[in-house]
């Protein structure tokens, strides 16, 4: 009889943060909104707060970057560690160190589903259907997968059953789809800059932006719009039809997450051939089931916000059973290892984090070391062939650990 590998137990869990409201300057990292000045990601992008003129020009003006980056590290009895990052900052540190630690320490490194279910159940009364608590749980879950992969010496995608394709092809999200085309991406997704409070003039301005990019990019390059929860059904429908002559591939997250009936109506009234997508700010498997039932074409969970890799795998299976695509919100290595195993994820998102979109920069820079970026718009599976998620923690980022246990 062959010997079965004996796996160690988890000895410690620790939580740090960088950036956020108490930082002197933008720190980047897991909270990619936490950037310095003159960055496209903070330049008059339409949001639910745009109707208030004081908060229209900058998303940082209403506090989009106050949380900062949460870093969770789990250490096994043998000294090996796994870690992950997300958006939850100092408050996430409190949740990990003062509540979730009891479900982690003492468990076997392979007990990921058990820990996940206990974290969900224990926080249900104060987590709702997403947000800060779910971000924190997601970060712990990802750290556990990283540790498990490092202990057994396998990349996470092989723990999930292996790749179903040789490479991942990407579209780029940023202000310059024309530059994304030059870099080899298959498409470019732009933020909208106007909303219902701007009336028909706002629709004309965003449609003109799409028309301009269509002229620059040619007829076949994908163009998409990210509306970031800033619209209502009427406005979104009118904008979709205004952009239809320019072959807009999809219109994304037009409505707040809870407006399921609105998404159903938008899908029903959208131009033929134009896809309706959403899911970035949804958390929990149950919310994605409701979203799937609206009939949208692509669900876009963020693996760092929806419940982690454990939940993302469940969402992908749910979508597959309904013939829907899952294209996760850009999450770098944490989504790369998942999507290369999903048959219903034919492409993925890469978020441009350089200020003017002119260069490729790792999404979670500077907190991750050895974080890969696409080459000619693609990442080959061989790039992912390192234990765990294949990245290391940059401990020179002035990590702060505000709590302990």
Curated annotation (Swiss-Prot):
Biological process (GO), any one: amino acid catabolic process
| Cofactor: binding comment | Binds 1 Mg(2+) ion per subunit.
As cofactor, the record names:
Mg(2+)
SMART domains of this UniProt entry? MR_MLE
What Gene Ontology molecular function terms does this protein carry? L-rhamnonate dehydratase activity; magnesium ion binding
Positions contributing to Mg(2+) binding: 226, 252, 280
Supply the alphabetized keyword list. Answer: Lyase, Magnesium, Metal-binding
State where substrate binds.
Answer: 33, 59, 349
Function noted in UniProt: Catalyzes the dehydration of L-rhamnonate to 2-keto-3-deoxy-L-rhamnonate (KDR).
Q: Which HAMAP family match?
A: Rhamnon_dehydrat (MF_01288)
Write the protein's name. Answer: L-rhamnonate dehydratase
Q: Which organism is it from?
A: Salmonella paratyphi B (strain ATCC BAA-1250 / SPB7)
Gene that this polypeptide is encoded by: rhmD
